[in-house]
Amino acid sequence: MDYKDTINLPKTSFKMKANLKEKEPQILQKWEDINIAYYLRNIRIGGTKFVLHDGPPYANGDIHMGTALNKVLKDIVLKYKTLRGYDAPYVPGWDTHGLPIEHNVTTKLGEKANALSKLEIRKLCEDYAMKYVDIQRESFKRLGVIGFWDKPYLTLKPEYEAKVLEILRSIVESGNIYRGTKPIYWCTECQTALAEAEVEYHDHTSDSIYVKFPLVGENNTYVIIWTTTPWTLPANVAIAVHPNFDYAKVEIGNEYWIMAKELVDKTLKEAGIDDYKIIDTFKGLTLEGEKARHPFVDRESLLVLADYVTLDEGTGCVHTAPGHGMEDYITGTKYNLQVISPVDSQGYFTDEAGKYKGMKIWEANKEIIKDLKENGFLVQSGKITHSYPHCWRCKNPVIFRATPQWFIDLEKNNYREKVLEEIKKVNWIPKWGENRISSMVRERPDWVISRQRAWGIPIPAIKCENCGETILDTKIIDHVIEIIEKEGSNAWFEKEAKELLPNDYRCPKCGGSEFKKEEDILDVWIDSGSSFEAVANSREELKKFPVDLYLEGSDQHRGWFQSSIFLSVAKHGIAPYESVLTHGFIKDEEGKKMSKSLGNVVNPKDIINKYGADILRLWVASADYRMDIKISYNILEQQVETYRKLRNTIRFLLGNINDFDPDEDSVAYEEMLEIDQWALMKLHNLIKNVTKAYDNYEFYKVHYLINNFCTIDMSSTYLDIIKDRIYVEGKKSKLRRSAQTVLYETAIALNKMISPILPFTAEEVYEHLNYSNKYETIFAELWPEYKENYLSEELEEKWNKIFALREDVLKALEEKRKEKFLGNSLDAKIILNLKDDTLKQILSQYDNNWIADLFIVSQFEFGNVDEGFEGRYATIKVTKAEGEKCERCWKVDPNTDNDPDFPGVCPRCARVLKEEINA
């Protein structure tokens, strides 16, 4: 007789094969159809607000793994918060001004760029930025990121630009903006000033030279300096020594050289000199005020004191050019030294450089070294490879160059100290972020905020044609804000100065009325750093200040986190964020940085096309992102395997609750079998721990906990044990409904817990779940709450012991399988001789059939075992079960085939079949 149709086999249309790359676009279309961001907002509006403010990616090129990682992390946070009942809207944004965009546009134009006006360049830059906003928007949506994609914030929008100028106005009003000539980073290729955050460090090979400066008033005596920038020697006006270091006068032939005593041997070895004698030593302090003669310019160099002089390299006598170095400039201010910077915006020497006029500075190195050698002032020359600042956009080496710029004064009004105090109040994740940003803020120079480019927000400064005064005041800014709010920042470049000024505006210095507008633009970090005001504190959906969270890469300690807190303190006196979370950078499998030249770049689109976005998101969740994160196709394959196990677990749950109506069929906790209560305990422990991990932004723990639960607690333990009960017991029996209640609750809760990480899979599962009052999307549901009364330590300890014994039994069965003694475990009978008294007491509460089900064998008994498998908790004898195999449940039973109504089945199955007929 065929009993196949009497078995409660799993039924579900939830497929084993995910086919994510085909399924995900369908779900995206559904989200589009229901307008999901607005749908969720309408449901959550009125709830506690949670604002994660989006740090704007740069609208330059398509997304890469770094931007994908960042957006997915943000999306995980916001989906979780939405499920927790928060009103957690996501307003994405883009940084759309600045040098990288302008550089790409002008590079593509080539020579044609020189013939275009600033307005024409700006129009091309806007088109370029908007093109990549659209491209990136589609890429982010494809990752499953939910947000107000139809109305993002863009730093080029007039309303945004006006807010930026409002912040600038606050800083001008406080007196913290000044115009000064001091050395700043300058890119000769891009022809603009750069802030620290716009500089990257790469290895660079430089000339390394030791030079003799004749000491005035002493025959044949020279101060020896070392430099890796020979081109800065025309600007030399001083030599710095450390007041507390010991300096030596070294006799070499008929000459006397002065340098730090500790560096004599090293310096002279490099110079190939081994015949020398130290004839005098003295403190650097004694050299202050002495003068040396410049080796090729008709002027003297003053010997000055500076604490930054080190003994790490060089001679302890530091070539000082205030026009080409910040430390040099500070020393120059102290000693009232001349600031010479004989280099133009393109890196060519000016008239001030004398015979080197018109030479490119890098090419002039060779000539300067040649002249020093011919004049007898070159001690030694060579090459050195060292870390050197490069432009973030064109990747060329930058220089320090003294030019007139606008600066934010970080000392006035205790500005820097106020920022440092606010940093202490922020929750930095990880904790080391606080020290990192604090040290950067403490050490950074005044902020150079002007740029000599076209694509950005103009600094509304004017120059008086009568007295030459450059003016930036609140009256002008207020008037320009009104214009830009209506017309956008192009207005500054379109209109004449008089059209941009208030009526009857007069020069505050001379009373003049004729003006010329300046055309410097603001540092792009002012743009993005103002977003707390222009977006978080302004957009209706957000309207929260300070916001709950900023989440970006750790490079933003020197970038957006820093610019934002400086500007927020200027405007409101407080930090713009309560918490700041940082992630590391993407590396390849071997921990190397990704680069096209190494051929190790992994593209997010390639991952999505091969595996689907959920696999990429699972990879994001798997890593402790606070450190650098490795990716490769091998690593992704591991996540594919993890996903497969999770999907199979969910499919099993869905397949076995297809006939379960939670309103009608649920079994109360108190009436459940104890193993079902254990499974609920495991589920609610999972809910508790996963919730804590999400709250702490520890998604790698979520990944681990869920994976562990599915593979160990569910698949290899509970689900294995209950298969017999749910397949074979009566369809509506309490035994089966008890297990189904667990499976149903697990499916509901597990799906919610995976949904922030695997939104596409969770939506697909949600479609297959049967319960009343379902929403259009799982993200409108509420997070599962764990029940404290389910978390019984006593129950856990008891079952830990039982499952430890079960491990022993499974090992014994596996041994017999290897010996070919057994095929299926249901062919076995287990005889146990327990070694543990507590286990004896526990198992005495259950009948032998129940224990056999636990071990997935047909028969079980306690007894003395002379020879058997020695487990940790028992000696185990595995024998063949006695009787015949039941045709329905496959268990072996001595009483199989005893019921004439149901031939070939065991007594249990005969009972079930009778009950089903009579039901």
UniProtKB/Swiss-Prot annotation:
GO cellular component terms listed in the entry, alphabetical order: cytosol
Subunit structure: Monomer.
Residue sites binding Zn(2+) per the record: 886, 889, 906, 909
Catalytic activity as recorded in UniProt: tRNA(Ile) + L-isoleucine + ATP = L-isoleucyl-tRNA(Ile) + AMP + diphosphate
Annotated organism of origin: Petrotoga mobilis (strain DSM 10674 / SJ95)
Binding site for ATP: 596
EC number per UniProt: 6.1.1.5
Record text about domains: IleRS has two distinct active sites: one for aminoacylation and one for editing. The misactivated valine is translocated from the active site to the editing site, which sterically excludes the correctly activated isoleucine. The single editing site contains two valyl binding pockets, one specific for each substrate (Val-AMP or Val-tRNA(Ile)).
Full protein name: Isoleucine--tRNA ligase
Motif extent ('KMSKS' region): 593-597
Xref: Pfam families: Anticodon_1, tRNA-synt_1, zf-FPG_IleRS
Subcellular locations according to the entry: Cytoplasm
Cofactor list: Zn(2+)
Catalytic class of the enzyme: ligase
SUPFAM superfamilies: Anticodon-binding domain of a subclass of class I aminoacyl-tRNA synthetases, Nucleotidylyl transferase, ValRS/IleRS/LeuRS editing domain
Motif 'HIGH' region mapped to chain: 57-67
Record-stated family: Belongs to the class-I aminoacyl-tRNA synthetase family. IleS type 1 subfamily.
CDD domains from the UniProt entry: Anticodon_Ia_Ile_BEm, IleRS_core
Positions with a binding annotation for L-isoleucyl-5'-AMP: 552
Record's cofactor remark: Binds 1 zinc ion per subunit.
The keyword Magnesium belongs to this UniProt entry's keyword annotation: no
A GO MF label: aminoacyl-tRNA deacylase activity
